[in-house]
A protein has these predicted regions:
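Helix-terminus/linker motif at the lipid-water interface of multi-pass membrane proteins
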Residues: 31, 35-54, 124-131, 187-194, ...
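Small-residue-rich hydrophobic transmembrane alpha-helices
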Residues: 53-114, 151-170, 277-341, 372-395
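Residue-level signal for short hydrophobic patches within transmembrane helices
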Residues: 12, 16-35, 39, 63-70, ...
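Short runs within selected transmembrane alpha-helices of multi-pass transporters and secretion channels
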Residues: 75, 143-162, 170-178, 199-214, ...
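Transmembrane helical elements of multi-pass membrane transporters/channels
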Residues: 21-40, 143, 154, 177, ...
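Transmembrane alpha-helix boundary and packing residues in multipass membrane permease domains
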Residues: 26, 30, 42, 80, ...
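Short alpha-helical transmembrane segments in multi-pass integral membrane proteins
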Residues: 1-23, 82-147, 191-247, 303-368, ...
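Small-residue hotspots at the loop-to-helix junctions and early N-terminal turns
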Residues: 48-62, 137, 141, 200, ...
Length: 450
């Protein structure tokens, strides 16, 4: 019961303190998640070569991000539903939502494994992946999709734990699997000389372990969110609720990734050095995105539980606190990444041309990252209340569609990496303004609390 009281402080305690208590484990988790993700890139970049670096960090990375991003969006639907029922102390519906979420993860994992393996090579060719990179990219993705079901189970399980206020145990899982992934990367690639195959095998093995650990935590808990294998099944009403919130979030992620894939196609036309630098940039600035995402997860859970408890004024106040913390964190990250860009890129590769391209890209884009903070936090807050359709439309129109339009107009008239990169701050600025207007119009906070 003591543990339950601690979790329920999200709806009762001092806002800034409870946000930080929930947020910090996620921040540390993002750190280990990024080490986990970048270990593959560092190992192939330094011990295999720039073709392998481009294979793991280029088109293959965009395709895997597209698939996983959609499912993470869907899992956020389950997290919102569970957090609202948990805040309302509705034990029966927490259980129904949890078991429906796991049934969906298993079914989706099987489907994506089959489809992913079949469509990998056509997708790589469609993206105009450089010829010297296609084969390694296909090998990496075939193995990656082979372990997709474990990836989805872990992401769903971790989302559920965070939804009920437990951000610590997902962190512990990330630490274990991060260390394991690095050890296996070095063993398979450096010791056994397995190249891209070794990197993919290390990633999948680590995902299997992470899925088993998260499932074990949910199976052994004595709380109302206990997982029972025999009860894993679809509940039609719960599935509808999860998909109502999850599909718009998933489509939002897909549109982000589609726009990034279109950008990758334009980058692929600029040569292997630029492709390798762009892929490395994606690994480096993922640190920033994952920290902001940690704030967004925090505010989604915080808003969701308080929404379920009927504490609307507390929700709005928590958004202001979270936005302030996010901006401070963003400033610190941007300063470090800007100042130490050459050294950071040298960790990934010794190729001077790749490093030079990468440093230019980072320093061009970093100042505009503040704008995205507004989108991330307001989107997370709105998602916690179940308002997902309009934010999805704003994101798809303001960020994704505008970005693609920019590439096929300005990108054609003024070809080059600077024009490609400019699509980010332009689309973010317009979308941020739209989110601010919608937030002040529709976000609960002026209603009388229960």
């Amino acid at each position: 019961m003591e543990k339950k009281e601690k979790v329920n402080q999200i709806t009762e305690g001092v806002i800034w303190k409870q946000l930080l208590l929930f947020f910090f484990p996620i921040v540390f988790g993002t750190f280990f998640q990024q080490i986990y993700n970048t270990a593959d890139t560092i190992v192939v970049g330094r011990f295999v070569g720039k073709q392998a670096l481009a294979a793991v960090g280029g088109s293959a990375s965009q395709i895997s991000n597209l698939i996983v991003g959609f499912f993470v969006g869907l899992s956020s639907g389950a997290a919102v539903v569970i957090s609202q029922f948990y805040g309302a102390k509705d034990k029966k519906n927490v259980s129904k939502a949890l078991h429906t979420a796991f049934a969906f993860s298993i079914a989706a994992g099987i489907f994506l494994t089959v489809v992913g393996i079949l469509l990998t090579r056509p997708a790589l060719l469609l993206m105009k992946t450089p010829a010297d990179v296609v084969e390694d990219s296909a090998i990496y993705l075939h193995i990656y999709f082979g372990g997709m079901i474990f990836n989805l189970i872990y992401n769903m399980g971790a989302s559920i734990l965070r939804a009920v206020g437990d951000s610590k145990r997902p962190l512990y899982v990330l630490i274990v699997t991060c260390v394991l992934n690095i050890i296996l990367d070095l063993l398979f690639v450096v010791a056994f000389g397995m190249g891209v195959t070794g990197v993919a095998a290390a990633t999948v093995t680590s995902q299997v372990i992470s899925a088993l650990l998260v499932m074990g935590m949910l199976l052994k808990t004595e709380e109302i969110y206990v997982l029972k294998l025999r009860e894993i099944r679809f509940d039609q009403r719960m599935l509808s609720s999860v998909l109502r919130i999850g599909i718009p979030a998933g489509l939002e992620s897909v549109m982000y990734n589609i726009s990034n894939i279109v950008i990758q196609v334009f980058v692929n036309n600029l040569g292997t050095d630029t492709v390798a630098a762009w892929g490395t940039l994606g690994k480096i600035d993922a640190i920033f995105w994952m920290v902001i995402n940690a704030f967004a997860i925090s505010i989604t859970t915080f808003v969701g539980q308080n929404y379920g408890a009927g504490k609307y004024h507390r929700m709005r106040k928590s958004v202001r606190v979270c936005m302030t913390m996010s901006m401070v964190g963003a400033a610190a990250l941007i300063a470090v990444m800007y100042a130490f860009a050459p050294w950071i890129y040298s960790l990934f590769t010794t190729d001077s041309a790749v490093i030079a391209h990468g440093v230019h890209m980072s320093r061009y884009l970093l100042p505009s990252y503040f704008i995205y903070v507004i989108i991330g936090i307001l989107s997370g807050a709105l998602r916690g209340t179940g308002k997902v359709l309009v934010p999805m439309i704003l994101t798809c129109g303001g960020v994704c569609s505008l970005r693609i339009l920019w590439l096929f107009t300005a990108g054609q008239m003024y070809p080059g990496i600077n024009t490609i990169m400019l699509s980010y701050p332009v689309s973010w600025s317009i979308t941020a303004v739209l989110f601010i207007v919608y937030y002040f119009m529709k976000f609960p906070g002026k209603k009388k609390e229960n």
